[in-house]
Amino acid sequence: MTIKYFLCLILICVCTNSYGSALHTQLVDDLNHLASNALMGRKTATEGAANTRAYLHSRLSKFNLNVSEQTFTYKSGIFEHAQGINIIAAPTKSTQRKKIIITAHYDHLGKRGGKYYFGANDNATGVAALLYLASSLQNKEFPYELVFVLTDAEENGLHGSKHFAQTLNSNNVLMNINLDMLGVKKHKSRVYALTSYSLKQKLKPVFTALNNTKITIKPVYSSKQMNRLIKSQNIDWHKASDHYSFAQNNIPYVYFGMGHDPHHHTTKDTVQHIDIPKYVSTVLAIEGFIKQLAHHHYDDLNAET
């Protein structure tokens, strides 16, 4: 065990004790395991991916949800195809209520040049957050049906979310909430909510009602605005993660993320480079957003981006 890793463990223990709740402790435990050697970088169609799914099944099986797998194939070259597996956790009793699809991709880059790419921020943070939300919201009363989807093969083309979104009837889905890269260590205590432009006025009361003193949710409605706020390169944030697959199928979205990460797709994307207290506060802010949606009854939301 390296000194740096030992210090990281101490940091996690201190931070989780400050929050007290067993749910918050589990959130950090999940993050730590998802970005560990045991899951070998979580690359699609590898032993690491299989180990990840086994862990996710074991966690989701503890909740009041029906857990299933969705296998899909996609082109991985001119003449080759590959297979991915999404994990879907839905209420045990289906209703006629509109669905909110909460997504996070669990795949990453695996092993390259003899080194594992652990993908702590990308996207163990999103997956651990989804597990937390599935647990904390499972017995809450909502005017909508919450469905949790852990997508595969996002890194090489959003393939898992493309397949899943195409199976949906957009008339039955209120929105997608996508969680990707929630642990960027920055000085501002802010998480960005990149949102379909059509939701700007409709979700304004929700964002206004939020009152989280540790983390501010900043609504953003264009890639240009997002790039300006985070002082990043010219990234098309509307197409940067799984939320784009839903937009392509006429389903509006809110994408929660922290912006550009200097350790993105490097071996330095580890738990040691995540601000744990800020990450936990970010997940709690997102939880607050979803709970606030329960106070607003939307019959339909247009998916124009």
Predicted regions and their residues:
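A non-catalytic alpha/beta surface segment that caps or lines the substrate-entry region
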Residues: R42-T92
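Sec-dependent signal peptide recognition
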Residues: T2-L9
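Structural recognition of the beta-strand scaffold that forms the well-ordered cores
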Residues: H33-A35, I88, K99-T103, V147-L150, ...
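Active-site-adjacent substrate-binding region
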Residues: S189-T305
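Acidic/histidine-rich catalytic neighborhood of metal-dependent amide-processing enzymes
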Residues: F79-I85, G110-K204, I235-H238
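N-terminal capping segment at the start of a domain
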Residues: A22-N51, F63, I177, P262-D269
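N-terminal signal peptide c-region/cleavage motif recognized by signal peptidases
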Residues: C13-N17
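Solvent-exposed loop/turn segments at secondary-structure junctions
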Residues: L39-G41, L60, K75-F79, K93-Q96, ...
